[in-house]
Amino acid sequence: MKQYIFFLALIVLVSTFAEAGKKTEILDKVKKVFSKGIAGVADLNNMSELGCPFIEKWCEDHCESKKQVGKCENFDCSCVKLGGK
């Protein structure tokens, strides 16, 4: 009976270490995905610097129709009302 308890405890101990190893693998995968996400945001920011001149004209026209002034930042068109009543 003591042998069964010993082997059961040994199996539990080994499975605990095996699970601990899997957690580090999962953590590495999460870190890898997170770093890819950060790289994607950096790429998008770099593209916005190139794409903004094309979008700038559209933004100016769009805001001009609202009688406002437009500015493009990171593919985001912001309309600002000048002067005001």
Swiss-Prot record:
Its main location: secreted. Pfam families: Scorpion_toxin_alpha-beta. Residues 1-20 form the signal peptide. Residues 21-37 form a propeptide. Expressed by the venom gland. The keyword Signal applies. The keyword Manganese does not apply. Keywords: Disulfide bond, Ion channel impairing toxin, Neurotoxin, Potassium channel impairing toxin, Secreted, Signal, Toxin, Voltage-gated potassium channel impairing toxin. It is found in: Secreted. Disulfide bonds join C52-C72, C59-C77, C63-C79. GO terms for molecular function: potassium channel regulator activity; toxin activity. It comes from the Eukaryota. Belongs to the long chain scorpion toxin family. Class 2 subfamily. This is Neurotoxin beta-KTx 17. It comes from Lychas mucronatus. The lineage of its organism: Eukaryota, Metazoa, Ecdysozoa, Arthropoda, Chelicerata.
